[in-house]
Structures are given as structure tokens and as C-alpha cells.
Amino acid sequence: MSLPAPLHPSVVHFPIALLATGSAIALVYLLGWRRPALPVIAWAMIFLGWLALFAAILSGLVDRNRAPDDAAVLAVLNPHIAAGFGLLIVYGLLLYERLRNPGVLEARQRRWYLLALLVAGLALVLFEGWSGGRLVYDLGVGVQR
């Protein structure tokens, strides 16, 4: 059995979908739509997305060796890599808050901090998707022509 080459495109969709949806659900809950199941769903999706992020980053770093060392590619690729590690940090902080206090979404004193982390996480997810799309569709990285 051999792994597909490149592997990164096969795994990258999971953290994007899980982190974006989990963040959106947590934001909806924080902003007032209080349904008992929402925190459970949000934290589960964020945790699974964070785990999937490790696979996406690892496969991306391996596949990076196949990318051309072109200045235009590196101008998009380097921020793309940095944002991936930023996602690990932002969502790691969110999960740490959840670990410290399982009811953190109910804590009024942490609301602005959580909102900031969730919005920053969503912004990074959007940037990751956009920059990854630029690498593939605009610059042809990983595409045989």
C-alpha cells in the first residue's frame, strides 16, 4: 500500500471544515443562541479539527519539498505555513481554556477572550484556505501541467 503523493490535499479539508464549523457553533452560542447541545458539538468539532490539523501540517511540510523554490510561490507558501502553526496555537489555547474550565462558554469574565480567539481562529482558517487555493490554482503547486 502506498500513500498518495502529494498527501496534503487529501487531509487538509478535515481541519478546515471541523475548525470553521466548530468555531461558528461556539460563536453562535456565545452570542446568545443558548442550546444545551451546542457547546458539546462545538468542543468536539474543535478538538477533532485540532487533531486533524497535525496531519495537515505534517503532510504539508513533507509535500513542501515538492514545491518549486520560486519567489512567487515562497511569498504565498511561507505565510501559509506560519498560519498553520498559528492555528495550532489559537485552537490549542481554546482547548486549554476548555480543559481548565469545562463550562468556560458560560463564564462571562472570559467571553471577550473566547470571542477574540474564535474570530482569530476563523480568520486564520479562511486565510489558510485562501492561500492554499492560491498555491494550487494560481501558482500550480502540486499540479501536473
Which residue ranges define each predicted feature?
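Polytopic transmembrane helical bundles with strong interfacial aromatic enrichment
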Residues: 1-145
